Structures are given as structure tokens and as C-alpha cells.
Amino acid sequence: MKLKEILTSIQPVKITGNQDIEITGVDIDSRQVESGHLFMAMHGTQTDGHAYIPAAVEKGATAILCEELPVELAEGVTYIQVADSEDAVGKAATTFYGNPSSKLELVGVTGTNGKTTIATLLYNTFRYFGYKVGLISTVCNYIDDEAIPTEHTTPDPITLNRLLGRMADEGCKYVFMEVSSHSIAQKRISGLKFAGGIFTNLTRDHLDYHKTVENYLKAKKKFFDDMPKNSFSLTNLDDKNGLVMTQNTKSKVYTYSLRSLSDFKGRVLESHFEGMLLDFNNHELAVQFIGKFNASNLLAVFGAAVLLGKKEEDVLVALSTLHPVAGRFDAIRSPQGYTAIVDYAHTPDALVNVLNAIHGVLEGKGKVITVVGAGGNRDKGKRPIMAKEAARASDRVIITSDNPRFEEPQDIINDMLAGLDTEDKKKTLSIADRKEAIRTACMLAEKGDVILVAGKGHENYQDIKGVKHHFDDKEVLKEIFSLTV
């Protein structure tokens, strides 16, 4: 593709050099650059891409996109100066890969909790209908049934457009994608055309990056502000920010709720550990999910599928066949008659939702033992809140290590313990070794009790000092169960 074709989607401040050259690849990582490539320099959170411009030129880059021009310009290289490289990178990548999102029905899901579940269940629903479908999520990316490992909730613009291009080339009609607040703030989705967007909820998370809840809200809201006129926005009325998200959107707004009058209205009729009986828009359905938060997630899936042209009755049949997403309220029965639940809940609100769901089924007939930690090098403010919420809704609490990253596990545990009063501490243990913490919970549990192992869900590693060590909560539980049969 000619460089001048790529530049039609952006507004350069200045161009130095030949625009008629052929570009054979686009990169934001100088290590990936080959002869004939366009290297795009961005100010990253860890490193500044501008520092790698000489290395990119050395490796054969024939064009450089940047915010600040180098002092010395290399001969035979075209330099494109832009005001906002993050925005330009997304748009340039979209153009280079042939605007793949315009060939797909791309639906984005954003919010603090529920993104993975909703995106994955939409993917499964539309595969049930017989379509080739793409999924971009925290757990894994899929091109129909081909699994592609994932690094981030939302990939960088080049990886993302390359992936969407493959999805379009391989015949996918629909793509369901988690849209993180980081990806919106960093404009990783710049240039993409969305057919629809779904808002789940907004609670405290990622304040290590956004600094304030207001900034976090603005990042989420921008996704809907930028939605095109012919798209839909489906928002959760049960969240106080639901209508705030869509107040400036050009898209058609629809609502879903378990509490209020809305376009897609739901309620929980019955709840058991085997599943729930629900009512969606005056239709009853039985599902293999537990908890009001999952009823809300399924209602969002129901609404989005209908807005994408499916009949309500057909969607209800599809929903009744679905299974919970890996690491999301993942229940395992022990030989001793207690239940262990592995869940990704890593925010105070998500933890409350899961614990409320457990109590809704138990109805006071068993104890709740919660094993929980908090991630290192992340929002420290939520640590004492996580511990407090666990203690409020549990009979016993074991504070343990999660992904400590570059912090000391005991320091994180101490931050969590600071949220507990004297009464809370009487029912709380602190065990830094996560495996030992889970084993202790199993020793404390009796028939009819529930153990919640929260925070990691689908993850099969512990991030310690920059190294990912294999660790899987569900594997650990199964191993303990097999030893105690």
C-alpha cells in the first residue's frame, strides 16, 4: 500500500519526504521493523517510542510517524509529524489492514465487571445460530473455533486490526470484543467501526492508571460518545452511570434492567447452585448460571442478540444451552459435600456480587469461607475495601497472595488487613502462600458449606517479580479433593 493512501485517514502536521513510497508493514515495536515498513512512535506508559526511531531506521523503516521529529532526519526516509500519535496509529493501522471492522458486525462490551462473560456468551450464542464468529477477550481470542492466546484485554491497534482482518478474511460475520478503559484512553480502538456497544457497570477499578473515578468514567463514556449514528448502545439502567454513559452518543440507545422498566426487562424467579429460572420480557427460561449479576449479564446478551436481528424466542433457546465462562462462578463439588467456587472477582463490587449470589442460594444453611487477595502494583485503595467486603459477607476469611508482581505479598496482605475491625479480625486468617490458604479453607469446610476462591478465576499463573509461575486455583482444589477422597 502506498504511504499516501495510509495518510488519508490521519491529519499530519508536517510531512518530510516522498509520500508515494510502498509500505509493506506497520509497526509500533522497533524490534518488529523490516525493510519497507512504517514505524509509528508513541509515548508509552513505560517507554517512549520516539527513542527507538534510530533503531527502526537502522532496520529498514522507510517511513516514520511521530509527534516530535528527530534532530537529524535520515536520508531516504519519509517523516510524518502528527499532533496525536495514539490516535494516528489506530487510524493508520485500520487503513493499512483494509478497514476490517467495516466488513464485520463488531460489538464492543465495556464496564468494570461482566465484560468477559457477556462477550463470550454472545460469541457462543451466535455460533449456536450457525455463524462464523470472532471473540476478543481477556481469556482468549477466537477466530471461529481457532484459539489465539491473548496478552491484554484489548490488543494494541496493529495486533487488533491484523486480527480483525483475519476474522473478516476467514468469513466471520460477527465479532464480540471486550473494550477496556485503558484501550479507550490510549486510543487503541481509534479508527474502528462499531455496530454496537454494551455498558455493564462502573465501580472502582484501575485507579492506579486513571487516578480518579471521574477519569475512569470519562474513558468508558468516550466509547459511547464516539459510536456512529447507525449503531446501537445498550446500557444497564441498574447502574447509576448507565444513562450518563449514553447521554452524548449519536447511536440509538436501548436499556436493560432487573429493577426498572426498560427495553429488555428481566427478573430472577428461582435460584439454585445448579442454575436459575429467569423471566426476560415476559418469557421464562432456565439457565445454568447463578446470581443476579449473571442474570444481568445474560439480559445484556439477550438484548444485544435481539438488536442484532435475532428473534426473542430463538435467543432464549440459545441462552438455555450456554455454560458459565471459565473462572466465572466456576463451581466444583467436593467429595465431602461442600462446594468450592472459583471466581475472577478482583474488585470490591464483583466480590460483593459473588458473595450475595452465594448467600442467595445458601439461605443461611451453610457457612461461607472466602479466600481472597489483591494484585500488586495496582490500585492500593481497593485493598482494605476488598477485605472488609469479604469479612462482611463471610463466616471465615483467609487473606492471601494474588499476583504480587513487584510488591511483597505480606505488604499487600497488611494493606488489606487495615480494612478490618476487631470483630472482623477474629474470623480472619492471613496465609501468604495461596495454595496453603486454599488447603486451609478446605480443612475448615464442612458438608453444606461454600468456599469462594476469589481474584484469579481463569488465570493459570501467579505473577511474582516479573515471572509468571504456573498456578491454577481450580487445579489446586481438584488436587486437594482427590487427596481427601
From Swiss-Prot:
The modification N6-carboxylysine is found at residue 220. Pfam families: Mur_ligase, Mur_ligase_C, Mur_ligase_M. It is an enzyme of class 6 (ligase). UDP-N-acetyl-alpha-D-muramoyl-L-alanyl-D-glutamate binds at residues 30, 153-154, 180, 186, 188. It catalyses: UDP-N-acetyl-alpha-D-muramoyl-L-alanyl-D-glutamate + meso-2,6-diaminopimelate + ATP = UDP-N-acetyl-alpha-D-muramoyl-L-alanyl-gamma-D-glutamyl-meso-2,6-diaminopimelate + ADP + phosphate + H(+). The keyword Cell wall biogenesis/degradation applies. Carboxylation is probably crucial for Mg(2+) binding and, consequently, for the gamma-phosphate positioning of ATP. ATP binds at residues 111-117. Its cofactor is Mg(2+). It is found in: Cytoplasm. Meso-2,6-diaminopimelate binds at residues 378, 402-405, 455, 459. Keywords: ATP-binding, Cell cycle, Cell division, Cell shape, Cell wall biogenesis/degradation, Cytoplasm, Ligase, Magnesium, Nucleotide-binding, Peptidoglycan synthesis. One of its GO terms (biological process) is regulation of cell shape. Its EC number is 6.3.2.13. NCBIfam families: murE, PRK00139.1-2, PRK00139.1-4. Belongs to the MurCDEF family. MurE subfamily. Catalyzes the addition of meso-diaminopimelic acid to the nucleotide precursor UDP-N-acetylmuramoyl-L-alanyl-D-glutamate (UMAG) in the biosynthesis of bacterial cell-wall peptidoglycan. This is UDP-N-acetylmuramoyl-L-alanyl-D-glutamate--2,6-diaminopimelate ligase. The lineage of its organism: Bacteria, Pseudomonadati, Bacteroidota, Bacteroidia, Bacteroidales.
